Amino acid sequence: MLLPCHWVLDATFSDGSLGQWVKNTCATYALSPVVLPPQPQPRKKATDKDYSAFHLGHLREVRLFLRGGTSDQRMDSLVLCPTYFKLWRTLSGSPGLQLSDLHFGSQPEGKFSLRRAVSVKQREEPQDWPLNEKRTLWKDSDLPTWRRGTGYTLSLPAVSPGKRLWGEKAGSLPESEPLFTYTLDEKVDKLVQFLLLKYQAKEPLTRAEMQMNVINTYTGYFPMIFRKAREFIEILFGISLTEVDPDHFYVFVNTLDLTCEGSLSDEQGMPQNRLLILILSVIFIKGNCASEEVIWEVLNAIGPWSALAGFADVLSRLALWESEGPEAFCEESGLRSAEGSVLDLANPQGLAGHRQEDGRRGLTEASPQQKKGGEDEDMPAAGMPPLPQSPPEIPPQGPPKISPQGPPQSPPQSPLDSCSSPLLWTRLDEESSSEEEDTATWHALPESESLPRYALDEKVAELVQFLLLKYQTKEPVTKAEMLTTVIKKYKDYFPMIFGKAHEFIELIFGIALTDMDPDNHSYFFEDTLDLTYEGSLIDDQGMPKNCLLILILSMIFIKGSCVPEEVIWEVLSAIGPIQRPAREVLEFLSKLSSIIPSAFPSWYMDALKDMEDRAQAIIDTTDDATAMASASPSVMSTNFCPE
């Protein structure tokens, strides 16, 4: 059995010479620790002939404190855990430790070799420990916890901050001798984030930027950290860094010619190829045939999930609020109610149900259900519409004027208009194009990447909460109130936050904000959906309920127009259902995902068929009414004709 010990080594260096080592040993087991008391000796230059070898056993942890030769100020500390050490003893009996390639400034301090540990019996006899012919200790059978063979040599990294590491040249570090794993991983992770921010901003980068913003004091390890980060973004995102200047000037190049949402517009945003690569890799590993359960098991490990599932989760929680009350809602969603009646939507996860708590940084991806019909377009992976990859733009005079117009309503009930269904979709596409042309004339905000995404989500959630409170109290809201109460120090991002919050409450609750005083930016609320629901029958507005209706219709529509009646009535028991055409549901989903309706081919055809059926019913009704009207005079003439 080996004796695990905790060693604290306090070293003193002076002019490149080994000084006195002071060691205190405490055993972690019940066995007596080995104590090597320091022996006083005059300082002299270290040479190999001044030392004879002895070995220490298995160490649980070694903490090495490094001090200046003429000062008691501690430079740094190095923790090694666990490993095997070879210690040296001078001819006078004073113990010393040799470290390999450990440079402070340009002064090497000797060699550090790893050897197999010794047994407890040998530990009890620290003097003249025997070595075999190969100058290694004991047999493998006597060392159950040591499996590295006859011997191993490893170099330790430099830890002194503010000094050149690993000799005179910063690039002289062998890449096979890394930092501690957690430090290396942390630096690689930070560099990956920095590279992605540069990619989103469409900016080149230099080695000096990476060293100054990420690498910091670990400049000697830059080649290793940069290589790992470069491989990571190339494998996962399909982005390659190409050096275009001998002075380490790099630009981003897409290595995969893939069609995805990010490549359909000039806005690069966060690369989305990684999800496709991941799914294709899983399919390839499984022999070109992977079940949906296997795919989702992999996707659940990294975060993306169905957009419609997230949307349904949000609205079902709101249904719980309406039917069961605030207490049941808060208990279900893990939120708290403020003052017993006000919904606390400051938690973005409770509001939108779309952000998981893993902290990495959240990229939203599409789910397999969103690929229905063989199309490549993606839908947002959250209940709330996804935040833009680049910030929206605003006109010079302030935030964009909010139109009270909501989703497109039913066409005029005439046979001609009802039959021209393709024109409806063309009109919807034209409206979308006109909106894009209008936004092209706005001025750009500071890039959203400079504001952390989680902070942006939180501000949007807080503003939605504030707007809903104002809606419940039937009070108008001003820009000054929003800036003072919610936005606070993020005033530069007000147009972006306000735009997302307004879009959210309009899509989910059917509430539009109309600017009734452009000078003071005073807004009032207006219902955009011409729907009959409980809240419109009384003077009390309360929490808007349109979202519940849209939820149920969406559920029926998504399930292929076939859902068990028990499931529907279980949800609708407290609110009262109303039928809406499939076209309006499809328009709503299209607006929510910013995709044209024809991107959902099967649902699109169903909606067209539904419209044709409705149009035919109107025609039949009109024909019947005409026939009855034409038949009426003849009947009357028969009744009143003279005998």
Curated annotation (Swiss-Prot):
The keyword Chaperone does not apply. Residues 347-421 are annotated as: Disordered. This is Melanoma-associated antigen C3. InterPro entries: MAGE (IPR037445), MAGE_WH1 (IPR041898), MAGE_WH2 (IPR041899), MHD_dom (IPR002190). GO terms for biological process: negative regulation of transcription by RNA polymerase II. Residues 383-414 have a biased composition (Pro residues). Residues 184-384, 456-643 form the MAGE domain. The modification Phosphothreonine is found at T478, T484, T485. The lineage of its organism: Eukaryota, Metazoa, Chordata, Craniata, Vertebrata. It comes from Homo sapiens. One of its GO terms (cellular component) is nucleus. Expressed in testis. Not expressed in other normal tissues, but is expressed in tumors of different histological origins. Residues 354-363 have a biased composition (Basic and acidic residues). Keywords: Phosphoprotein, Repeat, Tumor antigen. PANTHER family: MELANOMA-ASSOCIATED ANTIGEN C3 (PTHR11736:SF86), MELANOMA-ASSOCIATED ANTIGEN MAGE ANTIGEN (PTHR11736). The gene is MAGEC3.
